[in-house]
Design a protein with these regions (language model features):
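Glycine-/acidic-rich phosphate or pyrophosphate-binding loops and their flanking alpha/beta elements
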Residues: 4-10, 223-246, 259
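Conformationally flexible catalytic loops at phosphate/diphosphate-handling active centers
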Residues: 160-238
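Thiamine diphosphate
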Residues: 1-126, 133, 141, 339-348
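Peripheral docking tails and interdomain loops at the edges
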Residues: 302-351
Length: 351
């Protein structure tokens, strides 16, 4: 079945096919259609929708539902995402699967409702307290708003971790055709750890507190070991990169601009290609290094350089110090979007 829907609506459809039981949320532009869609479709399919009194309540309601073994989700935008950071840390600390969708808008402060990718650091590195991070995916189309929401639930369940679907206001509002899955994901069995009120789960304990420092350190190391194993699930894609002299690195909506930029440059005789991380955490370092080795690298992003810094860091960690040092950034902020003309002009300066 194919539907012509907004990216935000595609998120709700993906959540339903992933088997999401409960949606807790508070509407905020430009993510409000996710709450609207959940309010409409969840009850129709026997699922639960709760409009919370605020974003802080939403994420803590998710903690309770996840602790009871229910698949749950919330969605928000910049200011609301900030309010959820403590709760996401608690989810990570208790190793609870849950999905948070952030439709990034311009900031800081109230900002405006136009697109940015400026929430990169809290979405990817963990914006709350402690040594944690989420499994973070970055869709680039309405189709992927559905598909990667499903993946986020699968990875949250697999790794017992909060997962973030990181998109922006442009992706949330644009409309495209979305092919829906043929069937719903099977319900996972959480009885080995969840507190479900049954005899077999009565001794399960969900917590994130370790009063003994040695035990707290041991648990922290357990999390870091888990995050290292998560790297096996890193995803990326390349486009026209095999013979490229310049590699354009971008994710989300910026990756679509990057593809058109590469095509435009090639039409003018400049061999350009693209690398797109699909997961931002874990970051596909090895794949990036393979694509970037010996090439000029340019980043397109809607931020002040947070993503470009991560590209440099991952290239340097992969032993490509020269490529890392040469990374150039073309960006816009405040709700402005990089144009293909901007990117083509910047690329010509790099080569």
């Amino acid at each position: 079945m194919v539907k012509f829907v907004k990216g935000n609506e595609a998120v709700v459809m993906g959540a339903l096919y992933a088997g999401c039981d409960l949606y807790f949320g508070y509407p905020i532009t430009p993510a409000s259609e996710i709450a609207h869609g959940a309010a409409k479709w969840f009850p129709m399919l026997g699922r639960t929708f709760v409009q919370a009194e605020c974003e802080t309540a939403s994420v803590n309601m998710m903690f309770g539902a996840a602790a009871a073994g229910k698949l749950c989700m919330t969605a928000t935008s910049g200011p609301g995402f900030s309010l959820m950071q403590e709760g996401i840390s608690y989810l990570a600390g208790a190793e609870l699967p849950a999905v948070v969708v952030n439709i990034n808008r311009a900031g800081p402060g109230l900002g405006n409702v136009y697109p940015e990718q400026s929430d990169y650091t809290p979405a990817v590195k963990g914006g709350g307290h402690g040594n944690y991070k989420a499994f973070t995916v970055a869709p680039a189309s309405a189709q992927e708003m559905c598909d990667l929401t499903i993946l986020a639930f699968r990875m949250a369940t697999k790794w017992r971790t909060p997962a973030v679907v990181f998109a922006d206001g442009l992706q949330g509002q644009m409309m495209e055709s979305v092919k829906l899955p043929d069937s719903e994901d099977a319900k996972p069995d959480f009885s080995d750890w969840a507190a479900q009120g049954e005899a077999k789960t009565r001794t399960n304990l969900v917590k994130s507190i370790f009063l003994d420092a040695a035990q707290q350190e041991e648990f922290n190391q357990k999390l870091q070991d888990k995050y290292a194993k998560m790297e096996a699930d890193a995803l990326s894609e390349t486009y026209l990169a095999d013979d490229a002299g310049i590699l354009i690195v971008a994710y989300g909506i910026s990756s679509r601009i990057a593809r058109t930029t590469a095509e435009t440059l090639r039409a003018e005789g400049i061999k350009a290609g693209c690398f797109r991380p699909i997961t931002l955490s874990p970051f596909p370092r090895e794949a990036l290094a393979a694509a970037a080795k010996g090439r000029k690298v340019m980043v397109i992003a809607l931020d002040a350089g947070q993503f470009a810094d991560d590209v440099r860091l991952n290239l340097a960690k992969a032993g490509l110090g020269q490529e890392a040092a040469g990374v150039e950034l073309v960006s816009r902020m405040g709700g402005q979007v990089v144009t293909v003309d901007d990117a083509v002009a910047a690329a010509k300066k790099v080569v």
